[in-house]
Regions:
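Conserved catalytic core of the tyrosine transesterase superfamily
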Residues: 1-414
Length: 414
């Protein structure tokens, strides 16, 4: 407590009461999660005030309930004491610590689970166990099915045997008008998957998956959205000050994207054990939970080393390679966090790109390899494509080769 408060009387006052001894543990926990001293002081003062309120209400330690958090905050509000953003979370975190220490066994009540949500859990487990789909894929599928079920059954009982082809078509028509083409394709894929799952369980006998209409999609109809190769180096060079922890982190992330063509989610999910320093390799967990071991370029290794030695916070038990810069210091959540790093890097480099996400670095690497003479097969191996058809789109950006195939204009050029 001496790290937060200098006045001995303040510390003694905060430790009074049957729960006062847990204030010190709470302070240690806050520091471990990377909260700054000012934030820690505020949270500790709230916890101590919460303890005093419990004492005044004659609520024993083993009688503390989740509802008491709301009652306490309302009491503060009525007494004219301001409630700041984050106060509720601070008191709840202290209450969680009490539960972890077995001081109180009552858990925060969860909202009732609807039949649709119960079925979604079973479907998600099926995707994980039976189909071996990655969390990223499941996160994309499940919300669409949630909308489908709520739209058909509401919050009441779900009877899949009542589903008909018209229900499927109605949902597709209604939802497709609100989405871009790629999302429509994802939605119909998810819907077919769920309807096969329902038939697999015996909930339906009809093959309703066959009723999901096909969506027109020409995989080679557009060009890959990539940065011009000449703009990649300025993006890396204009990373915010590398003398800061955040700057070193962002430079390491951008180096992985630009040099290895990794997907944003793959970068965000890296853990410390994925780096094989002895053999200069890095393990990448891609689609379908497949693990690939890629050689680690020297500049990428140097960027990661700089971040690990002078940037990455030391958080006990946290194995993610890249951590948030603000408390709580946890690992990145999904590819959106990596995409945010890319977006800000492009803005700092003053590059006006139609795409702001991380995937454009992947396209740029492939286009650069093609221009330097690499075959589509070699590019597919680097990008870890399952099918050659996925790599075939990059043939469209090889303008020199395509120019030689163009037929001359009839009658010559005027």
């Amino acid at each position: 407590m001496n790290r937060f408060f200098k006045d001995v009387r303040t510390i003694e006052r905060m430790k009074r009461g049957p729960l006062g001894c847990y204030i010190t543990f709470y302070g240690d926990q806050l520091l471990a999660h990377g909260y700054r001293r000012k934030s820690c002081r505020r949270k500790l003062q709230l916890a101590a005030d919460f303890i005093r309120w419990l004492d005044r209400k004659k609520i024993l330690a083993n009688q503390v309930l989740a509802k008491h958090v709301g009652d306490y905050l309302q009491s503060r509000k009525r007494s004219g004491v301001g409630i700041h953003l984050g106060d509720r979370a601070a008191v709840i975190d202290f209450l969680k610590l009490l539960r972890e220490r077995k001081v109180t066994m009552e858990r925060i009540p969860q909202p009732p689970v609807t039949p649709s949500q119960e079925l979604l859990k079973e479907y998600d487990l099926y995707l994980q166990k039976e189909r071996a789909l990655s969390p990223a894929t499941r996160i994309n599928y499940v919300p669409f099915i949630g909308r489908f079920l709520v739209g058909r059954f509401g919050r009441g009982r779900v009877d899949l045997s009542r589903l008909r082809a018209v229900d499927v078509l109605k949902f597709v028509r209604r939802t497709a008008g609100q989405l871009k083409n790629k999302r429509v394709l994802l939605m119909t894929t998810a819907l077919r998957s769920f309807l096969r799952f329902a038939r697999y369980r015996g909930d339906i006998t009809l093959d309703l998956a066959a009723c999901v209409p096909p969506i027109a999609s020409w995989s080679l109809s557009t060009l890959p959205k990539s940065l011009p190769p000449a703009q990649v180096e300025p993006v890396l060079a204009n990373v915010r000050q590398r003398s800061t922890a955040v700057g070193r982190r962002d430079h390491a992330i951008l180096s992985l994207l630009a040099r290895l063509g990794l997907r944003g989610g793959e970068v965000g999910n890296l853990v410390l054990e994925d780096i094989d320093w002895e053999n200069s390799r890095i393990a990448i967990r891609g689609k379908g939970n497949r693990v690939a071991h890629l050689p680690m370029p020297a500049d990428v290794g140097k960027a990661i080393t700089a971040y690990l030695q002078n940037g990455r916070p030391r958080v006990p038990g946290e194995r993610r390679l890249f951590l948030r810069a603000r408390a709580p210091l946890t690992g990145f959540k999904g590819q959106g966090s990596v995409g945010s790093v890319v977006k800000h890097a492009l803005e700092r480099a003053k590059i006006d790109s139609p795409r702001k996400g991380s995937h454009q670095f992947r396209h740029t690497l492939a286009s650069t390899m093609l221009q330097k003479g690499s075959s589509l097969r070699e590019i597919g191996e680097v990008l870890r494509h399952r099918s050659p058809d996925t790599t075939a789109i990059y043939a469209k950006v090889d303008f020199l080769s395509l120019r030689s195939l163009a037929l001359p204009w009839p009658g010559g050029v005027p």
